Amino acid sequence: MNWGFLQGILSGVNKYSTALGRIWLSVVFIFRVLVYVVAAEEVWDDEQKDFICNTKQPGCPNVCYDEFFPVSHVRLWALQLILVTCPSLLVVMHVAYREERERKHRLKHGPDAPALYSNLSKKRGGLWWTYLLSLIFKAAVDSGFLYIFHCIYKDYDMPRVVACSVQPCPHTVDCYISRPTEKKVFTYFMVVTAAICILLNLSEVAYLVGKRCMEVFRPRRQKTSRRHQLPDTCPPYVISKGHPQDESTVLTKAGMATVDAGVYP
């Protein structure tokens, strides 16, 4: 499998991600991809060859192995990693589509034409929805594979000995799994890292939705508050007595000097 191509995808989408998205990429690449390539494949390399049953009946070890390991851990993890990282490629493709559209727009209207996008990689409009749906899809894929692992391998356990009575075995035979403790440790490790990735994806979804809601409702709240604030267009005036000879009146603005409204000789 070409893991260099997968690394290129993860590196390309890193510049379009939030802080939580960068943490997710680090967890996927370091704790899942590298561990899978360096260690997991070596641990499960001898899974069928060293699956030994205490019988010489031809075909019995093969059917017993298929009974307890219908799908290999390694192949399930490989499929899971591919499906989890593919949505990140959609984000990169969406940004590339924006760049191509911007290039054609400038070729048609000239280099001084107003830009279609203020920031090509800014998560607005369709790119925001693409990024959000990619997060939901990644969380759903990891959750689905955890459920599949739980159904196939009960409680993610790896027993040392399994009892098999499948045809063509003549009777119930005991079969022994190679390196069960080591395989159990790696299984738990991959399950925990997948759960962490699910938590990071859901946290990023909450962050994006919350930030978007604040951007939408904050201007409305400020506009509503300005409507309720009445301007001081009619300052209060106080009427007081004016000149004692003609009994004129004086208009006095609160806090200011008096203004004589009468007529003086």
UniProtKB/Swiss-Prot annotation:
Membrane-topology descriptor: Multi-pass membrane protein
PROSITE patterns for the chain: CONNEXINS_1, CONNEXINS_2
Could you tell me which residue ranges are on the Extracellular side of the membrane? Answer: 41-73, 152-184
Compartments, as annotated in UniProt: Cell membrane; Cell junction, Gap junction
Expression sites (tissue/organ): Detected in adult heart, kidney, skin and cochlea, where it is detected in spiral ganglion, stria vascularis, spiral limbus and spiral ligament (at protein level).
Q: Which GO terms describe its biological process?
A: cell-cell signaling; gap junction-mediated intercellular transport; olfactory behavior; sensory perception of smell
Q: What are the entry keywords?
A: Cell junction, Cell membrane, Disulfide bond, Gap junction, Membrane, Transmembrane, Transmembrane helix
Disulfide bond positions: 53-175, 60-169, 64-164
Function summary: Structural component of gap junctions. Gap junctions are dodecameric channels that connect the cytoplasm of adjoining cells. They are formed by the docking of two hexameric hemichannels, one from each cell membrane. Small molecules and ions diffuse from one cell to a neighboring cell via the central pore.
Q: How does it assemble?
A: A hemichannel or connexon is composed of a hexamer of connexins. A functional gap junction is formed by the apposition of two hemichannels. Forms heteromeric channels with GJB2.
| Protein name per Swiss-Prot or TrEMBL | Gap junction beta-4 protein
Which organism encodes this protein?
A: Rattus norvegicus (Rat)
Q: Which gene encodes it?
A: Gjb4
